[in-house]
C-alpha cells in the first residue's frame, strides 16, 4: 500500500516484478492504512486518517462490469485532525468490528492543522451505510485526553472486554471497558 496506489505481488513474491496499480491518492495518510471489507460486499476497502490535516475517511472499492477498479471516498470524520493510529477491533463485543482512534495534540509543535483543537479518543460504529461516532473521551488539552502516534487495545482485566491504552502529551491513560 502506497499513498498513490498499491502493489500486486507476483506468484513468487521473492522474485519477479511487483505490479503497481495507480488507483487512488491518499494524500497525507496516517500509518497504518487499514485494509478491511467495511461494507461486507466481499471487496477490501481502505480506512485512512489524515496524520497532518483534517479528516478520517474510508475508500470503498468497487469493480465495474469489465473488472475495472474504482475507489469511492466517504468521510467518516472530516472535523478532526491528526488521526495517526487507527485500529479495527470489536470494542463493544457485538461480533462486529469498530474503528478505534484518537486525535493527537500538537503533533509537530505548531505546524499541523487543528493542533490546538480539543483532543479525544473515539470509536466509530458501522451501521451498514455509514459510521457513527462514539466518544470515549473529549475536551481541551489538559482535560480531554487524546492519542499519541500509537495506542493499544487489549483485555487488561481478563473479563473479555477490550480496553484502550492511550499515550498522549500529558501522560498515559487507560480507558476500562465497562461494557453495557
Regions picked out by a protein language model, each given a short descriptive name:
Residues 1-180:
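Beta-propeller-forming repeat regions
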Amino acid at each position: 500500500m502506497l499513498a498513490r496506489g498499491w502493489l500486486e505481488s507476483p506468484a513468487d513474491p521473492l522474485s519477479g516484478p511487483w505490479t503497481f496499480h495507480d488507483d487512488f491518492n491518499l494524500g497525507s495518510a496516517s500509518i497504518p492504512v487499514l485494509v478491511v471489507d467495511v461494507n461486507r460486499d466481499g471487496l477490501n476497502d481502505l480506512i485512512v486518517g489524515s496524520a497532518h490535516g483534517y479528516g478520517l475517511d474510508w475508500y470503498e472499492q468497487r469493480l465495474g462490469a469489465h473488472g475495472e477498479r474504482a475507489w469511492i471516498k466517504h468521510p467518516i470524520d472530516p472535523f478532526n485532525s491528526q488521526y495517526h493510529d487507527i485500529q479495527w477491533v470489536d470494542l463493544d463485543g457485538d461480533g462486529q468490528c469498530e474503528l478505534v482512534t484518537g486525535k493527537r495534540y500538537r503533533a509537530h509543535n505548531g505546524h499541523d492543522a487543528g493542533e490546538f483543537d480539543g483532543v479525544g479518543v473515539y470509536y466509530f460504529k458501522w451501521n451498514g451505510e455509514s459510521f457513527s461516532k462514539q466518544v470515549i473521551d473529549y475536551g481541551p488539552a489538559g482535560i480531554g485526553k487524546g492519542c499519541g502516534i500509537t495506542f493499544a487495545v487489549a483485555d487488561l482485566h481478563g473479563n473479555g472486554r477490550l480496553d484502550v491504552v492511550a499515550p498522549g502529551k500529558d501522560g498515559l491513560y487507560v480507558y476500562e471497558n465497562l461494557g453495557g
